[in-house]
Protein backbone atom coordinates (compact mmCIF):
# COMPACT_ATOMS: atom_id res chain seq x y z
CA UNK A 1 0.00 0.00 0.00
CA UNK A 2 1.34 3.45 -0.84
CA UNK A 3 1.46 6.23 1.70
CA UNK A 4 0.22 9.74 1.03
CA UNK A 5 3.14 10.88 -1.11
CA UNK A 6 5.06 7.91 -2.52
CA UNK A 7 4.16 4.90 -4.60
CA UNK A 8 5.85 1.56 -4.07
CA UNK A 9 6.91 0.29 -7.51
CA UNK A 10 6.63 -3.29 -6.29
CA UNK A 11 2.84 -2.93 -6.22
CA UNK A 12 2.82 -2.94 -10.02
CA UNK A 13 4.86 -6.12 -10.43
CA UNK A 14 3.05 -9.34 -11.44
CA UNK A 15 4.58 -11.05 -8.42
CA UNK A 16 2.57 -8.74 -6.15
CA UNK A 17 -0.72 -10.29 -7.29
CA UNK A 18 -1.96 -12.88 -4.79
CA UNK A 19 -3.19 -16.29 -5.92
CA UNK A 20 -6.86 -15.65 -5.15
CA UNK A 21 -6.90 -12.43 -7.18
CA UNK A 22 -5.08 -14.06 -10.09
CA UNK A 23 -7.57 -16.95 -10.16
CA UNK A 24 -10.51 -14.54 -9.96
CA UNK A 25 -9.16 -12.47 -12.85
CA UNK A 26 -8.66 -15.60 -14.94
CA UNK A 27 -12.26 -16.65 -14.31
CA UNK A 28 -13.67 -13.25 -15.24
CA UNK A 29 -11.57 -13.06 -18.38
CA UNK A 30 -12.66 -16.55 -19.39
CA UNK A 31 -16.34 -15.70 -18.88
CA UNK A 32 -16.05 -12.52 -20.89
CA UNK A 33 -14.09 -14.19 -23.69
CA UNK A 34 -17.29 -15.86 -24.91
CA UNK A 35 -19.48 -12.78 -24.41
CA UNK A 36 -19.95 -10.14 -27.11
CA UNK A 37 -18.48 -6.75 -26.11
CA UNK A 38 -20.90 -4.20 -24.73
CA UNK A 39 -20.70 -1.88 -27.72
CA UNK A 40 -22.43 -4.44 -29.91
CA UNK A 41 -25.69 -3.96 -27.99
CA UNK A 42 -28.17 -1.17 -27.60
CA UNK A 43 -27.72 0.36 -24.13
CA UNK A 44 -31.24 -0.50 -22.99
CA UNK A 45 -30.66 -4.16 -23.83
CA UNK A 46 -27.64 -4.16 -21.50
CA UNK A 47 -29.56 -2.35 -18.77
CA UNK A 48 -32.41 -4.85 -18.93
CA UNK A 49 -30.03 -7.81 -18.89
CA UNK A 50 -28.15 -6.48 -15.87
CA UNK A 51 -31.38 -5.75 -14.02
CA UNK A 52 -32.39 -9.37 -14.65
CA UNK A 53 -29.06 -10.63 -13.29
CA UNK A 54 -27.47 -11.59 -16.60
CA UNK A 55 -23.97 -10.22 -16.05
CA UNK A 56 -20.76 -11.04 -14.19
CA UNK A 57 -22.24 -9.13 -11.25
CA UNK A 58 -25.08 -11.61 -10.79
CA UNK A 59 -28.61 -10.79 -9.62
CA UNK A 60 -29.46 -7.29 -8.44
CA UNK A 61 -30.62 -7.47 -4.82
CA UNK A 62 -32.93 -4.86 -3.36
CA UNK A 63 -32.84 -4.55 0.43
CA UNK A 64 -35.87 -3.71 2.54
CA UNK A 65 -33.88 -1.20 4.59
CA UNK A 66 -33.31 1.00 1.53
CA UNK A 67 -35.74 3.79 0.80
CA UNK A 68 -36.37 5.28 -2.63
CA UNK A 69 -36.99 9.01 -2.78
CA UNK A 70 -36.92 11.77 -5.35
CA UNK A 71 -35.07 15.09 -5.43
CA UNK A 72 -36.14 17.91 -7.77
CA UNK A 73 -33.81 18.26 -10.73
CA UNK A 74 -33.40 20.26 -13.93
CA UNK A 75 -34.80 17.43 -16.05
CA UNK A 76 -37.44 16.21 -13.63
CA UNK A 77 -37.37 14.35 -10.35
CA UNK A 78 -34.10 12.53 -9.63
CA UNK A 79 -34.28 9.11 -7.94
CA UNK A 80 -32.14 8.65 -4.85
CA UNK A 81 -31.62 5.54 -2.75
CA UNK A 82 -31.33 6.24 0.98
CA UNK A 83 -29.90 4.12 3.80
CA UNK A 84 -30.16 5.43 7.37
CA UNK A 85 -28.19 3.95 10.31
CA UNK A 86 -29.50 3.89 13.90
CA UNK A 87 -27.04 6.63 14.87
CA UNK A 88 -25.97 9.17 12.26
CA UNK A 89 -22.37 10.39 12.10
CA UNK A 90 -22.60 11.99 8.66
CA UNK A 91 -23.98 11.70 5.14
CA UNK A 92 -22.27 10.01 2.21
CA UNK A 93 -23.49 11.13 -1.21
CA UNK A 94 -22.80 8.21 -3.53
CA UNK A 95 -22.74 8.37 -7.33
CA UNK A 96 -22.88 5.05 -9.18
CA UNK A 97 -20.72 3.98 -12.10
CA UNK A 98 -21.60 2.47 -15.46
CA UNK A 99 -19.80 4.53 -18.08
CA UNK A 100 -22.46 7.27 -17.86
CA UNK A 101 -24.74 4.81 -19.71
CA UNK A 102 -25.54 1.99 -17.31
CA UNK A 103 -26.36 1.42 -13.65
CA UNK A 104 -28.72 3.09 -11.23
CA UNK A 105 -29.07 4.25 -7.65
CA UNK A 106 -30.83 1.01 -6.68
CA UNK A 107 -28.36 -1.47 -8.18
CA UNK A 108 -25.80 -1.75 -5.37
CA UNK A 109 -27.90 -1.98 -2.21
CA UNK A 110 -25.68 -4.51 -0.43
CA UNK A 111 -22.54 -2.47 -1.08
CA UNK A 112 -24.14 0.75 0.17
CA UNK A 113 -25.81 -0.91 3.15
CA UNK A 114 -22.38 -2.07 4.31
CA UNK A 115 -21.02 1.48 4.09
CA UNK A 116 -24.04 2.72 6.05
CA UNK A 117 -23.49 0.09 8.75
CA UNK A 118 -19.69 0.27 8.97
CA UNK A 119 -19.42 4.06 8.89
CA UNK A 120 -22.69 5.02 10.62
CA UNK A 121 -23.49 7.39 7.79
CA UNK A 122 -26.66 8.06 5.89
CA UNK A 123 -26.01 6.96 2.32
CA UNK A 124 -27.80 8.93 -0.38
CA UNK A 125 -27.12 7.33 -3.75
CA UNK A 126 -27.94 9.62 -6.64
CA UNK A 127 -29.55 8.37 -9.80
CA UNK A 128 -28.90 10.47 -12.87
CA UNK A 129 -30.05 10.57 -16.46
CA UNK A 130 -28.07 8.18 -18.64
CA UNK A 131 -26.43 8.59 -22.04
CA UNK A 132 -26.87 8.27 -24.94
CA UNK A 133 -30.51 9.26 -24.48
CA UNK A 134 -29.36 12.02 -22.13
CA UNK A 135 -25.79 13.03 -23.00
CA UNK A 136 -23.59 15.53 -21.19
CA UNK A 137 -24.46 17.69 -19.28
CA UNK A 138 -27.49 15.75 -17.99
CA UNK A 139 -25.54 13.54 -15.56
CA UNK A 140 -23.54 16.29 -13.81
CA UNK A 141 -26.63 18.53 -13.80
CA UNK A 142 -28.53 15.87 -11.84
CA UNK A 143 -25.64 15.17 -9.46
CA UNK A 144 -25.26 18.89 -8.80
CA UNK A 145 -28.96 19.09 -7.97
CA UNK A 146 -28.69 16.26 -5.42
CA UNK A 147 -25.59 17.83 -3.87
CA UNK A 148 -27.33 21.19 -3.61
CA UNK A 149 -30.36 19.52 -2.03
CA UNK A 150 -28.10 17.92 0.58
CA UNK A 151 -26.28 21.19 1.23
CA UNK A 152 -29.60 22.87 1.98
CA UNK A 153 -31.47 20.04 3.69
CA UNK A 154 -29.11 17.51 5.29
CA UNK A 155 -29.43 18.96 8.79
CA UNK A 156 -33.20 19.01 8.67
CA UNK A 157 -33.47 15.61 6.98
CA UNK A 158 -30.69 13.70 8.72
CA UNK A 159 -29.51 15.81 11.66
CA UNK A 160 -26.01 16.54 10.36
CA UNK A 161 -24.10 18.69 7.89
CA UNK A 162 -21.06 16.41 7.78
CA UNK A 163 -21.04 15.50 4.11
CA UNK A 164 -18.78 13.20 2.10
CA UNK A 165 -19.07 12.55 -1.64
CA UNK A 166 -17.82 9.68 -3.74
CA UNK A 167 -18.39 7.03 -6.34
CA UNK A 168 -16.91 4.45 -8.63
CA UNK A 169 -15.75 4.78 -12.25
CA UNK A 170 -18.06 7.31 -13.95
CA UNK A 171 -19.36 8.08 -10.47
CA UNK A 172 -15.90 9.21 -9.40
CA UNK A 173 -15.71 11.53 -12.41
CA UNK A 174 -19.13 12.95 -11.54
CA UNK A 175 -18.12 13.34 -7.89
CA UNK A 176 -15.23 15.62 -8.84
CA UNK A 177 -17.39 17.49 -11.36
CA UNK A 178 -19.97 18.00 -8.62
CA UNK A 179 -17.37 19.33 -6.17
CA UNK A 180 -16.13 21.77 -8.81
CA UNK A 181 -19.64 22.94 -9.67
CA UNK A 182 -20.60 23.38 -6.02
CA UNK A 183 -17.50 25.50 -5.45
CA UNK A 184 -17.84 27.60 -8.62
CA UNK A 185 -21.60 28.03 -8.89
CA UNK A 186 -22.72 28.00 -5.27
CA UNK A 187 -19.64 28.89 -3.22
CA UNK A 188 -20.15 25.65 -1.31
CA UNK A 189 -17.17 23.81 0.17
CA UNK A 190 -19.05 21.73 2.71
CA UNK A 191 -18.03 18.27 1.53
CA UNK A 192 -15.42 17.08 3.99
CA UNK A 193 -13.89 14.38 1.79
CA UNK A 194 -14.09 12.63 -1.57
CA UNK A 195 -14.01 8.85 -2.12
CA UNK A 196 -12.79 8.41 -5.70
CA UNK A 197 -12.62 4.79 -6.79
CA UNK A 198 -11.09 3.83 -10.16
CA UNK A 199 -12.48 6.92 -11.83
CA UNK A 200 -11.99 8.10 -15.39
CA UNK A 201 -10.99 11.75 -15.30
CA UNK A 202 -9.82 12.38 -18.87
CA UNK A 203 -12.23 11.83 -21.76
CA UNK A 204 -9.33 12.32 -24.21
CA UNK A 205 -7.96 9.10 -22.64
CA UNK A 206 -4.82 8.70 -20.55
CA UNK A 207 -1.92 6.50 -21.73
CA UNK A 208 -3.07 3.46 -19.75
CA UNK A 209 -6.45 3.56 -21.51
CA UNK A 210 -4.97 4.10 -24.96
CA UNK A 211 -2.39 1.35 -24.53
CA UNK A 212 -4.67 -1.25 -22.95
CA UNK A 213 -6.00 -2.70 -26.20
CA UNK A 214 -8.50 -5.52 -26.62
CA UNK A 215 -7.94 -7.51 -23.41
CA UNK A 216 -11.43 -7.83 -21.92
CA UNK A 217 -11.29 -7.49 -18.13
CA UNK A 218 -14.62 -5.71 -17.57
CA UNK A 219 -13.28 -2.85 -19.70
CA UNK A 220 -11.01 -2.46 -22.69
CA UNK A 221 -9.98 0.47 -24.85
CA UNK A 222 -12.84 0.20 -27.32
CA UNK A 223 -15.49 -0.13 -24.61
CA UNK A 224 -14.16 2.99 -22.89
CA UNK A 225 -14.20 4.86 -26.22
CA UNK A 226 -17.80 3.75 -26.70
CA UNK A 227 -18.78 5.06 -23.27
CA UNK A 228 -17.06 8.38 -23.92
CA UNK A 229 -18.56 8.88 -27.38
CA UNK A 230 -22.08 8.24 -26.13
CA UNK A 231 -21.65 10.54 -23.14
CA UNK A 232 -19.79 13.47 -24.71
CA UNK A 233 -21.47 13.47 -28.15
CA UNK A 234 -19.32 16.19 -29.67
CA UNK A 235 -18.67 18.32 -26.59
CA UNK A 236 -15.13 19.44 -25.79
CA UNK A 237 -13.37 16.52 -24.09
CA UNK A 238 -10.91 18.95 -22.47
CA UNK A 239 -13.68 20.87 -20.71
CA UNK A 240 -12.94 20.41 -16.98
CA UNK A 241 -16.63 19.74 -16.40
CA UNK A 242 -16.21 16.63 -18.59
CA UNK A 243 -12.56 15.81 -17.88
CA UNK A 244 -11.83 17.09 -14.36
CA UNK A 245 -8.16 16.17 -14.71
CA UNK A 246 -7.86 19.57 -16.44
CA UNK A 247 -9.67 21.55 -13.75
CA UNK A 248 -8.42 24.04 -11.21
CA UNK A 249 -8.38 21.69 -8.24
CA UNK A 250 -7.49 24.23 -5.57
CA UNK A 251 -9.62 24.09 -2.47
CA UNK A 252 -10.77 20.52 -2.94
CA UNK A 253 -11.40 18.34 0.14
CA UNK A 254 -9.17 15.43 1.19
CA UNK A 255 -9.49 12.56 -1.27
CA UNK A 256 -8.88 8.83 -1.36
CA UNK A 257 -8.05 7.47 -4.82
CA UNK A 258 -8.34 3.68 -5.15
CA UNK A 259 -7.16 1.79 -8.23
CA UNK A 260 -6.18 -1.72 -9.26
CA UNK A 261 -3.10 -2.38 -11.35
CA UNK A 262 -5.08 -4.30 -13.98
CA UNK A 263 -7.55 -1.50 -14.62
CA UNK A 264 -7.25 0.38 -17.93
CA UNK A 265 -8.06 3.55 -15.97
CA UNK A 266 -5.00 3.22 -13.75
CA UNK A 267 -3.28 6.37 -15.04
CA UNK A 268 -6.41 8.43 -14.38
CA UNK A 269 -6.07 7.80 -10.64
CA UNK A 270 -2.28 8.18 -10.63
CA UNK A 271 -2.47 11.49 -12.49
CA UNK A 272 -5.43 12.83 -10.50
CA UNK A 273 -3.79 11.96 -7.19
CA UNK A 274 -0.70 13.92 -8.26
CA UNK A 275 -2.76 16.90 -9.43
CA UNK A 276 -4.79 16.86 -6.19
CA UNK A 277 -1.59 17.10 -4.17
CA UNK A 278 -0.05 19.71 -6.48
CA UNK A 279 -3.12 21.91 -5.96
CA UNK A 280 -2.39 21.93 -2.23
CA UNK A 281 -4.95 19.37 -1.14
CA UNK A 282 -4.65 16.23 0.93
CA UNK A 283 -4.75 13.03 -1.10
CA UNK A 284 -4.26 9.35 -0.43
CA UNK A 285 -3.60 6.77 -3.12
CA UNK A 286 -4.42 3.10 -2.59
CA UNK A 287 -3.01 0.79 -5.27
CA UNK A 288 -4.23 -2.82 -5.35
CA UNK A 289 -2.06 -5.40 -7.16
CA UNK A 290 -4.08 -7.26 -9.76
CA UNK A 291 -7.25 -5.31 -9.09
CA UNK A 292 -9.44 -5.12 -12.19
CA UNK A 293 -12.16 -2.57 -12.83
CA UNK A 294 -14.95 -2.86 -10.20
CA UNK A 295 -12.96 -5.55 -8.31
CA UNK A 296 -14.26 -4.31 -4.97
CA UNK A 297 -17.80 -5.45 -5.82
CA UNK A 298 -16.76 -9.11 -5.81
CA UNK A 299 -16.26 -11.52 -2.85
CA UNK A 300 -12.46 -11.63 -2.78
CA UNK A 301 -10.00 -10.59 -0.08
CA UNK A 302 -8.61 -7.77 -2.20
CA UNK A 303 -12.11 -6.26 -2.30
CA UNK A 304 -12.42 -6.54 1.48
CA UNK A 305 -9.10 -4.76 1.85
CA UNK A 306 -10.12 -1.94 -0.46
CA UNK A 307 -13.56 -1.50 1.05
CA UNK A 308 -12.17 -1.46 4.58
CA UNK A 309 -9.78 1.31 3.56
CA UNK A 310 -12.66 3.26 2.01
CA UNK A 311 -14.83 2.81 5.10
CA UNK A 312 -12.02 3.91 7.41
CA UNK A 313 -11.52 7.00 5.27
CA UNK A 314 -15.22 7.91 5.48
CA UNK A 315 -15.25 7.33 9.25
CA UNK A 316 -12.29 9.66 9.62
CA UNK A 317 -13.91 12.28 7.41
CA UNK A 318 -17.08 12.54 9.49
CA UNK A 319 -15.33 12.30 12.85
CA UNK A 320 -15.10 15.11 15.38
CA UNK A 321 -11.34 15.27 14.85
CA UNK A 322 -11.42 16.59 11.28
Model-derived segments and spans:
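Catalytic active-site module of serine/aspartate enzymes centered on a nucleophile-bearing elbow/loop
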Residues: 299-322
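Short beta-strand element of the alpha/beta-hydrolase
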Residues: 89-98
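A glycine/proline-hinged amphipathic helix-loop "lid/cap" segment
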Residues: 1-82, 301, 319-322
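Alpha/beta-hydrolase active-site loop
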Residues: 134-154, 310
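Short beta-strand/loop motif that positions the catalytic acidic residue
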Residues: 257-259
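Hydrolase active-site cap/lid region
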Residues: 180-235
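Alpha/beta-hydrolase fold nucleophile elbow
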Residues: 156-169
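Short amphipathic alpha-helix adjacent to the substrate-entry channel of hydrolases
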Residues: 106-126
Amino acid sequence: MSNLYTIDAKLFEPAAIDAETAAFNERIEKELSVAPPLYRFEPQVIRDARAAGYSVFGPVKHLDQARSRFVPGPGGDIPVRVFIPPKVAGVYMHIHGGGFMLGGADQQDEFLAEICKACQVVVVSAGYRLAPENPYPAAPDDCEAVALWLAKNSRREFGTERLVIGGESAGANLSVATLLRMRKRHGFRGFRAAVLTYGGYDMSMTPSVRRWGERYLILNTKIIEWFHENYVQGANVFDPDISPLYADLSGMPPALFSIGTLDPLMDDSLFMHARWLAAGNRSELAVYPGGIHVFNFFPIKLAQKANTRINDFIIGAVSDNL
